[in-house]
Amino acid sequence: GQNAFIVVCPASIVINWMREIEKHSELKPFLVHGPSRERAFDQWQAEGGVAITTYETIQRLKHENLDTIDLLVVDEAHYVKNPDAKRSQTIYSLTERSENVLYLTGTPLENQLAEMVNLVGKLQPDITREMENSVQYIGSNIFKEKIAPVYLRRNKEDVLTELPELTQVEEWLSFGQEEGQIYREAVRNG
């Protein structure tokens, strides 16, 4: 059968996910957001590919009857750190029905260690069962060792060597009459 992948992300980056999947994959992306979300969701279920949706939209869709999801990607996963929130519960339900799950976040630990432990627990419950009294792990290398199977931290220094050479392009444009007038006035007024 077809591969069934879902990307759940904030609305502000849905288009970026669409563009990157089209650019780097042969999988068909489906924008499951906006007025045609139901139709796109049905089409994705029938054809396979990558459904790209938002946290708000996924809560409205009827996904209870979904077969197994091959891969669930949760971008900005810190949005689901509160286990009592409806958004979090929806994502946790999808997580349980997914063969593979990838939580992406630049801020896994915003306020309390328990928030990160909660996210890790959705991916590897065995790890967090060992860490029930998480206070003892704050700032410790033991905590880092415990979560290592599910946590990859990349700093800018780690990836700088993997990036392509910086390309700078200068493009000079001429102002129109009105734009030139606004510019000169802005320069005069400092």
Regions found by a protein language model. Give the residues of each.
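Conserved helix-turn-beta segment of the N-terminal RecA-like "Helicase ATP-binding" lobe
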Residues: 13-35, 123-127
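Short glycine-/polar-rich loops that comprise or flank the Walker A/P-loop
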Residues: 2-3, 27, 97-100, 114-115, ...
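Conserved helicase motor
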Residues: 31-39, 55-60, 81-84
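Conserved motor-coupling elements within RecA-like helicase/translocase cores
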Residues: 38-51
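Conserved nucleotide-binding/hydrolysis micro-motifs of P-loop NTPases
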Residues: 12-14, 37, 57-58, 107-111, ...
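Inter-lobe coupling linker of SF2 helicases/translocases
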Residues: 52-58, 63-68, 86-87, 92-99, ...
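Walker B catalytic acidic pair
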Residues: 75-76
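Conserved Walker A/P-loop ATP-binding site and its immediately adjacent core
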Residues: 2-23, 110, 114-115
